[in-house]
């Protein structure tokens, strides 16, 4: 990574080539920043775009660091997500791993998973646990990871010191995240011995089914997702049959329509650019 927090945005020297990914280090502070073209994450093709973006950010109320990262190739299905819980003694006790299938395409939602299929990868779990235990971390953590198609390595992008907004993928696979926190810190109950690795099969999704299946290019992965739908192992946290409020029952439909509209337009634009580049 490179970071820019100096007076001259053009003075940034990058250890990697363009294109690059740029984003604020503090999403909380960035929430209050207001400037034309604001996005959650920026995908920048050249130095001119980087300078313009940094200048726009510096003109806003945002005073934190702005991170610039190497662009790792691969679509959303190359992303991985890992949720962990470390007990009050700093020992990792629970992990749940998944493969992202589709991410939000709205400017302020980029990077938020819309669909995750449960997976297991004990190598990644071991690497994350080694880091967490080395620093004495406690509580929930959420890792963003990407598989680099150039060498098959796993690139750890960041660790969020909390549950991720899509943590329902853990629940969908059969594990209650609240149980770990309650038993460890509130009820004082002993946790299961050793490390518990989630192994349930599920498809977490808040994306329209047609959009999700259309986005996935890999035939084997698409068949797997179709199979999970057929088995009824898909779970949408916005779909709550017991909800009595008409407004809340309608919201998932509105959300799905907005996602369908945004994703359809973004996917059409991307495929047009790919065709033009051939």
PLM features: residue spans?
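Phosphate-binding site of ATP-dependent enzymes
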Residues: 5-7, 44-106, 119-126, 147, ...
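Acidic/histidine-enriched active-site and ligand-binding environments that engage anionic O-linkages
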Residues: 12-21, 92
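Glycine-rich phosphate-binding loop of ATP-grasp-fold ATP-dependent ligases
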Residues: 19-53, 79-81, 103-116
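Glycine-rich phosphate/pyrophosphate-binding beta-alpha loops
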Residues: 29, 101-105, 109-113, 160-174
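Flexible, glycine/charged-enriched surface loops at secondary-structure junctions
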Residues: 67, 138-142, 191-197
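Oxyanion-binding "anion nests"
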Residues: 106-110, 118-143
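Conserved metal-phosphate-binding beta-hairpin within the catalytic cores
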Residues: 133-168
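Peripheral (often C-terminal) accessory segments that flank ATP-dependent C-N-forming ligase machineries
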Residues: 182-278
């Amino acid at each position: 990574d490179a970071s820019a927090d100096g007076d001259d945005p053009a003075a940034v020297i990058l250890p990697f080539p363009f294109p690059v990914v740029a984003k604020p280090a503090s999403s909380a502070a960035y929430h209050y920043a207001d400037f034309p073209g604001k996005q959650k994450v920026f995908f920048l093709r050249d130095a001119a775009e980087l300078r313009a973006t940094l200048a726009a950010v510096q003109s806003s109320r945002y005073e934190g660091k702005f991170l610039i990262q190497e662009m790792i190739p691969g679509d959303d299905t190359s992303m991985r997500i890992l949720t962990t819980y470390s007990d009050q003694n700093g020992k990792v006790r629970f992990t749940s791993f998944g493969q992202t299938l589709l991410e939000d395409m709205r400017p302020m939602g980029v990077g938020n998973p819309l669909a995750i299929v449960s997976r297991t990868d004990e190598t990644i779990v071991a690497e994350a646990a080694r880091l967490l235990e080395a620093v004495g971390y406690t509580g929930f953590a959420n890792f963003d990871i990407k598989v680099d198609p150039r060498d098959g390595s796993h690139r750890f992008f960041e660790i969020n010191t909390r549950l991720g907004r899509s943590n329902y993928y853990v629940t969908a696979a059969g594990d209650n995240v609240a149980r770990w926190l309650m038993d460890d810190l509130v009820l004082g109950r002993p946790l299961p011995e050793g490390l518990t690795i989630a192994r349930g099969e599920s498809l977490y999704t808040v994306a329209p089914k047609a959009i999700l299946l259309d986005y996935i290019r890999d035939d084997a992965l698409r068949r797997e997702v179709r199979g999970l739908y057929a088995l009824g192992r898909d779970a949408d946290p916005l779909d709550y049959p017991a909800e009595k409020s008409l407004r809340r029952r309608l919201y998932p439909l509105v959300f799905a329509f907005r996602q369908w509209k945004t994703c359809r337009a973004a996917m059409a634009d991307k495929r047009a650019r790919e065709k033009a580049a051939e």
